[in-house]
Amino acid sequence: MAQTLSFNGRRRVRKFFGKIPEVAEMPNLIEVQKASYDQFLMVDEPEGGRPDEGLQTVFKSVFPITDFSGASMLEFVSYEFEPPKFDVDECRQRDLTYAAPLKVTLRLIVFDIDEDTGARSIKDIKEQSVYMGDMPLMTNNGTFIVNGTERVIVSQMHRSPGVFFDHDKGKSHSSGKLLFAARVIPYRGSWLDIEFDAKDIVHARIDRRRKIPVTSLLMALGMDGEEILSTFYSKSDYKRDGKGWRVPFQAETLKGSKTLVDMVDADSGEVVVEAGKKLTPRLLRQLQDKGLKALKATDEDLYGNYLAEDIVNFATGEIYLEAGDEIDEKTLPIILDAGFEEIPVLGIDHINVGAYIRNTLAADKNENRQDALFDIYRVMRPGEPPTMDSAEAMFNSLFFDSERYDLSAVGRVKMNMRLDLEVADTVRVLRKEDILAVVKMLVELRDGKGEIDDIDNLGNRRVRSVGELMENQYRLGLLRMERAIKERMSSIEIDTVMPQDLINAKPAAAAVREFFGSSQLSQFMDQVNPLSEITHKRRLSALGPGGLTRERAGFEVRDVHPTHYGRICPIETPEGPNIGLINSLATFARVNKYGFIESPYRKIIDGVVTKDVIYLSAMEEAKYYVAQANAELNAEGKFVEEFVVCRHAGEVMLSPRDTINLMDVSPKQLVSVAAALIPFLENDDANRALMGSNMQRQAVPLLRAEAPFVGTGMEPIVARDSGAAIGARRGGVVDQVDATRIVIRATEDLDAGKSGVDIYRLQKFQRSNQNTCVNQRPLVAVGDILNKGDIIADGPSTDLGDLALGRNALVAFMPWNGYNYEDSILMSERIVSEDVFTSIHIEEFEVMARDTKLGPEEITRDIPNVSEEALRNLDEAGIVYIGAEVQPGDILVGKITPKGESPMTPEEKLLRAIFGEKASDVRDTSMRMPPGTFGTIVEVRVFNRHGVEKDERAMAIEREEIERLAKDRDDEQAILDRNVYGRLLDTLRGQVSIAGPKGFKKGVELNNAVISEYPRSQWWMFAVEDEKVQSELEALRGQYDESKSRLEQRFMDKVEKVQRGDEMPPGVMKMVKVFVAVKRKIQPGDKMAGRHGNKGVVSRIVPVEDMPFLEDGTHVDIVLNPLGVPSRMNVGQILETHLAWACAGMGRKIGQMLEDYQKHLDITELRTELVDLYASESHDEVARFDDESLLRLADQAKSGLSIATPVFDGAHESDVSEMLTRAGLHTSGQSVLYDGRTGETFDRKVTVGYMYMIKLNHLVDDKIHARSIGPYSLVTQQPLGGKAQFGGQRFGEMEVWALEAYGAAYTLQEMLTVKSDDVAGRTKVYEAIVRGDDTFEAGIPESFNVLVKEMRSLGLSVELENSKLETADTVNPLPDAAE
């Protein structure tokens, strides 16, 4: 038997239903973010040897900066980062940005310029390190901390630079003719469009300006008309042959055309092909084989052809005809009269080769390079008179200047591929050859050769990740800075300055700040649970600067494309206006150095599927035949079926097995992380799977997390990579554990420079961005032996290192008194009383004491006109105690603000004069709990400005913090001492000593007894004979001293930070933050969901005894509506329910066996059952467990067996039936249920089982809202709207109709006036109510006045006339409304 395994019970072992072995390791899920930013900063690269990437390139592209006269130059040497001032946690607490100071070494070179020759010689060189602002650092979890909040930079999808060929789909012209166009898109610089118009003339546009003929562009590149024609067309010579002409036979040009007249051999005179025949390649080959060299042609055949060269009289220099002119009845005699026997003709036949470029040249008004350049200059800078120099300089700067134009490596690679060029990817500007190749390719497309590009193909879209976005932003900042530096260099005495004096780093720092603070791609991290964090970091957005906008994005961009397979998830995308524009990276996908998304494949060599994995981008994949991961293989790794389903060039087909070159790595490689967490995804409709993926991201972490019975095997990966569950950084032994930290003595990876101790601080009840609770719990005990990567602590929504978003609840699918109508959920009271779906939310309240004009505000317990009862929770500093239970209206922090002095009466002045100064007026501006919030205070933080005296509470918090730091230092010191003195003792033992502490005899052999007579600190005094050992001792001593001083230094730094005052916004003297933990039990109105898009609202909570129950008396927890399944087609929830029911049954069975074992102590039966149960092709570890491990596993499984059914490779119906049978349950998965109210059985059996339910972050407590008296809008005087503004309910148009329909006139009047915006009426009603009177009079609503004012502003005179009606007998009938 193989080596036995021990199982520590700190992870969950799942029965695995997948058949396909995992060949490739899944890449780290936040690799996209980390790799990209590391490549940008290159912190670990040596300063001198950094490659030209990221920050290094930015500096190199902007520097050297030369002043306007050329007398001095500022060069970039290198850059380095200093250690950040505060660590991640300190930044979070103090609302700072986690960043490292960037120091750049610059070299200023001053030249002497010889006035006569203009030669430069170096006069002076100065080098200096200059501070260039702070550069934000990424945390280990792939986020940034900006002003104390965690943010994520989302990667952007954009069109790759390069050349694209497209047509207008026949929309531009009424005839429906396809107009082809090519567009060269650089990474930065001017766009070049080359396009056909309806008359088949080729135009060029620069930056979408006015179009110019493409021949003008070519002339500007230095070509003349004849050269342009010879570039685009072949040439054939017509030679005079008696009366007719002789023309060379060219098989290529004739392919596929029809003969209009007989083809006659010029040499023999015989007819080789008759008129009206099609020239097939076979026929042409036969003619070539026969030796046909030339054909006979008449004058008529010459007509309609175009001259390939100018027809010139060389004697006089007279040009008879120019290249490109048409030969017809008028021009042919001119040529013949001039005595030309041979006419060069362009190879245009209007069928295979069109005359587009020739026609464009004929239509082009520009004759030469100067005209063309002037024309381009006028287009780009209308209104400026061109000169040759300015026009040439402008044209060169458009496409050929690396400062202004950058194709980027990607753009060059794409151009090379599309145009079949071989140019190094360091050539990042356009060349004349590139432009010619683009025009040629475009003309060929018009001639019907080649294909247009699909811009939605992932080969043509690339990802810009953090590093690249940051690089572009920093470049902008440096360019702004460059202008300022140039000006300063020219205006200052350059001989006396240092680089520091020239540089103002503000623009660069501002660019960074602006990017992280306000860019559309820098987003507040979605931190509801670990899954939402990971998904946010893997998100790809097509929006943002330089991307699409929601309004303009069409259907094609949003749609799923065949190249998305294995790269972008086809399921996970938001519902609503952003659908398809925001996507998620697939599980195995990664981004390559060019920014294209790659997916992994297994190689197939000689028909055998190997374990070699290669990553391919969409472009590279197109040429392969790729089999799916679930294709059946035999033992040798060959395909079983003769024909295999595979993908090729975006199509799915059946292909013979020997044509297949690659195979997918895993069935879950085509979906994203969130979709891969849905078991039985293959049985759900795509729309519901989309909702399921999106709703898992909104799951609130519960008080007690519980991993699902039915998982997919992705759960531990998400928990680990998100950083929610803590893994051991290196192997070791647990030395100390409490709720707030774990101390591990490392046994692996003990480098000289590293400490031998790892201290893990656990987060306790911290607030996340979405107010959910982040709390970590240790899983290890003192003495546990750990390997690297073992999970040592659970975080929010994790259970034994598995992601656990919800709870397993016993559900029944049946109607129950209409309480589950329209997806409502009926719930048992047990769930409330046992806190099954209870969650903790943490709210943060912040109060600042500012320095006002009237004097400073003060935080104090001494508040005017407040009862002692209201102050019961405050300490002497006026701040609430930790642990206090608070409710709406309770004071959290007492604060008073000086009030403006009111003018004093003479009597007051007299009293003042007699009794001295009375206390200045203050008003109470304390912070109170908002309405509807109850909770417990869990943390208070006090921040003081530098130089402001700290209050008692601040001192207490500071002392506590310093004690905590000291404890950490002492523990680390103790472990260090234990390790070092242990090694010292081992080294000394058995050695002969030549020196020692005071009173020690030389020459004694050292042993434990001898050494331990002396205190440990004196052991270093021993010296031994063996020189090698002596040098080891000295090295150990040096290492120990260094570690000790490093530890002490670190402690001192941290203490200094704690004691130092805090940086505050201007005018703020003191700030207090109070954190309140709110316990939210589930209640009617809360939204819940399963993992299959089955969402609903809790409608009623029923006493346990009224809920339906099973034969053994177990009451179900939740009753769901069976009608929610058929129309939604998410059958996965039913399969999950059945399988989880079997898991619970198996758990009971294993529990029974455990009890039997405890009676008889015979483990054989339990071992057989478990080994058989967990046996799987890909997981056989349970068979190797020792007895103790087996008992631990059984203990874990007795509450319900955990299983994994991976997506697209999970349990089948037969597996579900087998599990049910094994657990001793009916294979239908249905049970007899009894009505809890009557005790009678229901008519039919009901589907009962466990479903994994999650509580979503849409809680009724956050939404319910009522208003008494509140704020009004300034202009309309109507109440504000929304809970945040304490607003009113909108009584809209349709509600008014309803009251009109009922004829409730007075209610309606009240709604439109005194309850809304009749200002005077409101006051009167209030007074009337105070008086006890219940009558009121409505006035004019303010909104009517607003309307009148608006009409007046449009110049309409609106007057309100109050004319009395005449007496009753002479009443005029009112005019009819229609008149």
Curated annotation (Swiss-Prot):
GO annotation terms (biological process): DNA-templated transcription
Superkingdom in the source lineage: Bacteria
Keyword entries, A-Z: DNA-directed RNA polymerase, Nucleotidyltransferase, Transcription, Transferase
EC number(s) stated in the UniProt entry for this protein: 2.7.7.6
Keyword GTP-binding: no
Recorded catalytic activity of this chain's protein: RNA(n) + a ribonucleoside 5'-triphosphate = RNA(n+1) + diphosphate
Keyword Zinc-finger: no
InterPro entries the record matches: DNA-dir_RNA_pol_bsu_ext_1_sf, DNA-dir_RNA_pol_bsu_external_1, DNA-dir_RNA_pol_su2, DNA-dir_RNAP_su2_dom, DNA-dir_RNAP_su2_hyb_sf, RNA_pol_bsu_bac, RNA_pol_bsu_CS, RNA_pol_bsu_protrusion
CDD domains recorded: RNA_pol_B_RPB2 (cd00653)
Annotated PANTHER family: DNA-DIRECTED RNA POLYMERASE I SUBUNIT 2
Known function: DNA-dependent RNA polymerase catalyzes the transcription of DNA into RNA using the four ribonucleoside triphosphates as substrates.
Family according to the record: Belongs to the RNA polymerase beta chain family.
Protein name: DNA-directed RNA polymerase subunit beta
